[in-house]
Curated annotation (Swiss-Prot):
GO CC annotation terms, alphabetical: cytosol
Similarity-based family: Belongs to the phosphoglycerate kinase family.
Keyword Cytoplasm among record annotations: yes
Residues with the Phosphoserine modification: 183
Assigned EC number: 2.7.2.3
UniProt-recorded name of the protein: Phosphoglycerate kinase
Protein's GO biological process: gluconeogenesis; glycolytic process
Gene: pgk
Source organism: Bacillus cereus (strain B4264)
Amino acid sequence: MNKKSIRDVDLKGKRVFCRVDFNVPMKEGKITDETRIRAALPTIQYLVEQGAKVILASHLGRPKGQVVEEMRLTPVAARLGELLGKDVKKADEAFGPVAQEMVAAMNEGDVLVLENVRFYAGEEKNDAELAKEFAALADIFVNDAFGAAHRAHASTAGIADYLPAVSGLLMEKELDVLGKALSNPERPFTAIIGGAKVKDKIGVIRHLLDKVDNLIIGGGLAYTFVKALGHEIGLSLCEDDKIELAKEFMQLAKEKGVNFYMPVDVVITEEFSETATTKIVGIDSIPSNWEGVDIGPKTREIYADVIKNSKLVVWNGPMGVFEMTPFAEGTKAVGQALADAEDTYSVIGGGDSAAAVEKFGMADKMSHISTGGGASLEFMEGKELPGVVCLNDK
């Protein structure tokens, strides 16, 4: 990575404004999944060990520029203190006199959590005045929030206009892993693209067709490709306005020598429920009032075989409606194939794919699980991320 990280700067005694991603799911004031807090620990611990005064900023939920009591970061600060094994202070503001006073009272190695930055309307507008207020608290800006790196907000990008700006360890790792996958991949390189909609994945499919040896398609978006081949798809998801594009992608794959894999059989149903009756049919045999909801067993075998023979696999998007047991087998099979493939480096592109490997207890078998759904998708589309562009070059 050609951006400076916290390893490249002197931190002792410095006030560090560190943007983290503590946007964790909450239920009745309790954190239900603390993965994102744990992901930030190495950076926070490094800053503490280096004798920095660690000022943490994050958003939580979508308060839309207003104070929403349930979205305060107080429970997060409390849990962070437990995980760090030290006293973590919490400010009820994200800038201004109260925050400044608390920062002024900090000693080297102290940790302070600021209030939810999205309580202020200027955050999502990347307001320069708000960015200046944040910058006034600190000597150095550290961005460790890869999950928000695709957003040009005051605390992720704007603040870098007023302070030296470097990446944290999590951000550095994300950029290294994803950057290497796209610029210098080990081969065979396979991308697995799933999820519901073609329109969400157009950019990533187009960009990856220039990079990969194999492209595997699954999930709801597969049926647009199936229809593009002239097959009936019953009530399956389809974007009729993307059929021509699907044809174009298949033609492009052929021209570029990319092996393009699509389902050969699918799981179909007449209803969405945990007790739904399902059938397995060939891809050209979906009845008119049934809907495709997962890849079938033959497809799972083919996909697993491609995975096993790949050196690098990037996975973005599930193979079916994995949240429901009858439609989860395809996604589970892809996860299992990745877990079993010992010579394969697996990169899970955040969002639903990350949720799936967590759900099936396979997370520890994956080489890298990205902490950013939207950010990793935009990175894989070849877009520049505002939260990265703003960092100082080495």
